[in-house]
């Protein structure tokens, strides 16, 4: 009889302990919040597209907090320091240059869009009207500056040293028949300086933010074969993070591609 009572007591104690454990487990599970990613973007099209991605990702249990930046420098600084988890604003040549200069441990996890760079003017009807001694604005960061110089070469304004490619710098100009004066400015500031320039090479995201319509206002644009595809970037240790993979899945959805096609009408091109 004593054995039976003792066995029953042990059984009841075990059931009680298991009940507590189950309750704690359920309580713990109930407190788990959906994963949130802080995603850094530049104002304009990158932010607009990410707002669409955000809504799609939320259906998959992923919350995205969009953090807007006003230049090309801080999004990588913030990502490297851990202030944000992801950024989406730059192309691969620009990232490669930043990694080389600053030794950031950052990697690409997916393609996003292409923003064709354009040549803009408030003074000329076409590039043939460009006068000797004209003032030309290009971005002052090495990658986009090189991109702008290649564009100027393509329209016949300058000639560069053979083989310099995307690493072209102003010092690589070997022919400048119109003796143009090149002003290297912060990419985000160039649209505001357009009235003071004869022509300017402007990144599409900043052109749109300034109220320009690339397909209408640019007198020349890069084509879809541009090597400057924009990318999603994370710290190397987060490359396989499931939340990051959910972000890429949402970005590469049919809904996002349709939004890009209908909203930007060719000024921005989906690159996946």
Predicted regions and their residues:
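Periplasmic-binding protein-like
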Residues: 144-153, 251-271
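A conserved helix-loop-strand patch within extracytoplasmic ligand-binding domains
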Residues: 109-158, 257
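A bilobed periplasmic-binding-protein/Venus flytrap-type ligand-binding module shared by bacterial periplasmic
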Residues: 116-127, 229-241
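Short, well-ordered beta-strand elements
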Residues: 32-44, 62-68, 135-136
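Ligand-binding "clamshell"
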Residues: 97-109, 122-124, 196, 201, ...
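Short, low-complexity disordered leader/linker segments with a strong preference
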Residues: 1-36, 272
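Beta->alpha turn/N-cap motifs
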Residues: 44, 70-72, 82, 86-96, ...
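Short helix-initiation/N-cap motifs at beta->coil->alpha
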Residues: 67-77, 164-192
